Amino acid sequence: MDRAGPRTVMELGVALMGAGLLLAPLTREPWHLYLTLGVLVGGGSVCLGYSGQSLFLPYWFVRRRGLAMGLAFAGVGVGSITLLPWMQLLIESAGWRAACVAMGLLVLVVLVPINLLLRKRPQDVGLQPDGDAAPPPGVAARPASNVVDTAWAAVDWTLGRAMRTARFWWIAFGYFCGLYAWYAVQVHQTKYLIEVGFTPIVAAWALGLVSLAGIPGQIALGHLSDRIGREWVWTASSLGFVVCYLALILLQQSPTELLLYVMIAAQGVLGYGLTSIFGAIVAEIFEGRHYGSIFGTLMLAAIIGGAAGPWVTGALYDLLGSYTLAFWIGAGLSGLSTLAVWRASPRKVRVVAGRVHRLAPRSA
């Protein structure tokens, strides 16, 4: 992304995902599925999803960075609600192979032309961040007014320099814990709800409602982060996962609809807000020419956490015959992720638009 820009990265993602979906129907061995739906589609989704979008959206928006990213990532929920039922109907009527071909063609036809319109920075097409007017010819652009730590912001942050700071590792730890908690519950909640007494249909609908609730949650919390700061919204989102885990634990003793809806609302409306500020936190601490490589490396920690969460949760269930300890661990790691983001303290480098008026002229 730092060298080639979003069009190359996104179109690579389209090619990988399209190839994986179109080749999957030709599989004859299990490893064929691992390669097509696992490696190719999985790799494509990394380029096209949260990681890919977060690599260039922060360049386009400063004052409304959280809102912009919340709107972008809310599309995941919209896609889940609209496309998954269609895919299910197609699988039931024509089989999974036909469904893969249809989805592969849809990905290629829709995303290839759309991604050709992408640019890394607004300056590449004569614009300014947030839609501001460009300065007159010969007049330098006014420097950003949201910088708190001028010495830190003046550094040309490379990946190597970033990795030698405590902030980098606090972010990595926070992202690991955050995605551990997210994917641990997302992968196991349907099975758990059936286990405590809900019907398979209700359990499946609960997961769908979480995605639905996440749409306004991501947008609202992204906007809120532009007003009060990234740390506070990360705290609210992590609290959502803590409440979600506590509700799941209580459901074991009292499987009521009220607790089910509390779990859904906490996870969707609050928890999904994490995605709205993933890129913003890193951009405000390590903004610069090498932001892409820094963010991409930090997302490795997030991906490892997202993979570890479901695996550890499943292993503990197999060992103990219960999800209780695993859910307590998820809740605890949500709390630790909050501590880590506060320690990284993006507000001490650059403040959000809603706090700019509180800045007093100073240098670090």
Residue ranges, per PLM feature:
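C-terminal ends and interior cores of transmembrane alpha-helices
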Residues: 15-28, 240-253
